Amino acid sequence: MKLLVVDDSSTMRRIIKNTLSRLGYEDVLEAEHGVEAWEKLDANADTKVLITDWNMPEMNGLDLVKKVRSDSRFKEIPIIMITTEGGKAEVITALKAGVNNYIVKPFTPQVLKEKLEVVLGTND
């Protein structure tokens, strides 16, 4: 299963990718910002989950989510936002834009596992 991780921090991308690897997800694409993410998603339409940060240069995560949701190929792709923006207003804004689940940094691997299970419908 192909996943796309988007974060301007290479450290955060590595942490997320390592966590996903421990969970059995090996086919993980990476992007540094929304523009690069859109290019990778466009070239890899079989991507099953998008995990994105909010605050990034060039195109932020919220704008990326809106762009993804406006494309008929990706209307149903599960999107998890992982960000430091943890206020109630930010969560509501992200959910209204089309995010399926939301994680506030810092987070534990267990939280990412559970959020992935929820968006993929594999939770017990």
From Swiss-Prot:
Interacts (when phosphorylated) with FliM. It comes from the Bacteria. GO terms for molecular function: metal ion binding. Its cofactor is Mg(2+). It comes from Helicobacter pylori (strain ATCC 700392 / 26695). Phosphorylated by CheAY. Dephosphorylated (inactivated) by CheZ. Mg(2+) binds at D7, D8, D53, N55. InterPro entries: Bact_response_regulator (IPR050595), CheY-like_superfamily (IPR011006), Sig_transdc_resp-reg_receiver (IPR001789). Residues 2-120 form the Response regulatory domain. The keyword Cytoplasm applies. This is Chemotaxis protein CheY1. GO terms for biological process: archaeal or bacterial-type flagellum-dependent cell motility; chemotaxis; phosphorelay signal transduction system. Gene3D superfamilies: 3.40.50.2300. It is found in: Cytoplasm. Its main location: cytoplasm. Chemotactic response regulator protein that modulates the rotation direction of bacterial flagellar motors. Plays an important role in the colonization and infection of Helicobacter pylori. Upon phosphorylation by CheA, interacts with the flagellar motor protein FliM to cause clockwise flagellar rotation and bacterial reversals, as opposed to straight swimming when CheY1 is not phosphorylated. Keywords: Chemotaxis, Cytoplasm, Flagellar rotation, Magnesium, Metal-binding, Phosphoprotein, Two-component regulatory system. The modification 4-aspartylphosphate is found at D53. Binds 1 Mg(2+) ion per subunit. GO terms for cellular component: cytoplasm. The keyword Phosphoprotein applies.
